[in-house]
Amino acid sequence: MDADKIVFKVNNQVVSLKPEIIVDQYEYKYPAIKDLKKPCITLGKAPDLNKAYKSVLSGMNAAKLDPDDVCSYLAAAMQFFEGTCPEDWTSYGILIARKGDRITPNPLVEIKRTDVEGNWALTGGMELTRDPTVSEHASLVGLLLSLYRLSKISGQNTGNYKTNIADRIEQIFETAPFVKIVEHHTLMTTHKMCANWSTIPNFRFLAGTYDMFFSRIEHLYSAIRVGTVVTAYEDCSGLVSFTGFIKQINLTAREAILYFFHKNFEEEIRRMFEPGQETAVPHSYFIHFRSLGLSGKSPYSSNAVGHVFNLIHFVGCYMGQVRSLNATVIAACAPHEMSVLGGYLGEEFFGKGTFERRFFRDEKELQEYEAAELTKSDVALADDGTVNSDDEDYFSGETRSPEAVYTRIMMNGGRLKRSHIRRYVSVSSNHQARPNSFAEFLNKTYSNDS
């Protein structure tokens, strides 16, 4: 008997078959490098840098950039950015550089070259006859890499947000040590012609390489990071949110997770803390794993750990944090239940609201204030109607312990208290809610209950 088969009847005929499903080609992929090989891309033949500069600049002025030529130029231009490595630099067992070595972005990765010549057209006319200076090369590299940042800005940002960022970036790359090489608004005009460049693997790879280099190596032209900084922890919003959350509540990751009272957290916590990843290693390839092509589907994104993401931002909303109110709810990950847990944790860790006395004349005054607040909360618990007098002993100890918080939720039937709902409504109703945001969810869900 085949253990994989099932037997059943169709029109009195016995059928035996093995149920098979489509193999998921998009499984989460962890970024750890196990073969000691650096991240790698293949580009066309290395160009003459002066010719390439003139071609790419003329393409920028005409808003007609060839992505292959741009990538080939960016890889070749790495030679202009040499700095000293401050410490031995290793990641996933790969030695990138030794302390004191003079390095460019090149040793971080492997760039293979073919014999295929680039296009190197002069679409915008031939304006520059002399050879460009290093600062002109640096300015062009900075402007090109900024196209990555601009293409990552989502359509949710309203008004002139993107134009304002493009203008500020242009100002950076026309101020010393850089030099003005394009007219005002050229960057935004060019971006419109290549708005999806963040999806081009080689361009994304080079943006991540430059960012990894400038985040570690002090350099005259470090401001180039203004265009590449979005490659750091890209598609890691779940893990980044969790990290920010534990810093806020001043607990270790282990202590914080004890408050995650929901069965759907189990898979996500396991996913987020898979062993063998360099999540806590500074300047690791992990930080830029998405742009360097080490993972096709991030296990650390908001969608990959949606329950954790929802909970953290509901707690953030309870605190009135704009970032949380603006974040997008992961609708498939129990937002109602997460909002309940978020209300209780928000109250436990952040008090009844934003306004509290935080500063005192001396230690004695601080202790007196804390003692008075403790008495107040004991009275509130006794009068709440949700706590029986039998439970007073239970609450007189560590009221913030996971056991105490869990018991409180259970005693309220897994529902929010009126005070929680009032808090949620007050923070969300004063906020201009974006579509599908946490603010909109709280407004729609709780505004009638307050």
Swiss-Prot record:
- What is the residue range of the signal peptide feature? none
List the keywords (alphabetical).
Answer: Capsid protein, Helical capsid protein, Host cytoplasm, Phosphoprotein, Ribonucleoprotein, RNA-binding, Superantigen, Viral nucleoprotein, Virion
Q: Select a single GO molecular function from the record's annotations and give it.
A: RNA binding
Q: Which residues carry this modification: Phosphoserine?
A: 389
**In terms of one coarse class, where is the protein primarily found?**
virion
Location in the cell reads: Virion; Host cytoplasm
Q: Which GO terms describe its cellular component?
A: helical viral capsid; host cell cytoplasm; ribonucleoprotein complex; viral nucleocapsid
Remarks, anything else? Displays a superantigen activity in human and mouse, activating mostly V-beta-8 subtypes of T-cell receptor.
Cite the record's note on assembly: Homomultimerizes to form the nucleocapsid. Binds to viral genomic RNA. In nucleocapsid, binds protein P and thereby positions the polymerase on the template. Protein P acts as a chaperone on free protein N to prevent it from aggregation before encapsidating genomic RNA.
Family the UniProt entry places it in: Belongs to the lyssavirus nucleocapsid protein family.
Protein role: Encapsidates the genome in a ratio of one protein N per nine ribonucleotides, protecting it from nucleases. If expressed without protein P it binds non-specifically RNA and therefore can bind it's own mRNA. Interaction with protein P abolishes any non-specific RNA binding, and prevents phosphorylation. The soluble N-P complex encapsidates specifically the genomic RNA, with protein N protecting the genome like a pearl necklace. The encapsidated genomic RNA is termed the nucleocapsid (NC) and serves as template for viral transcription and replication.
Would you tell me the protein name for this molecule?
Nucleoprotein
- Lineage, highest ranks first: Viruses, Riboviria, Orthornavirae, Negarnaviricota, Haploviricotina
**Gene giving rise to this polypeptide:** N
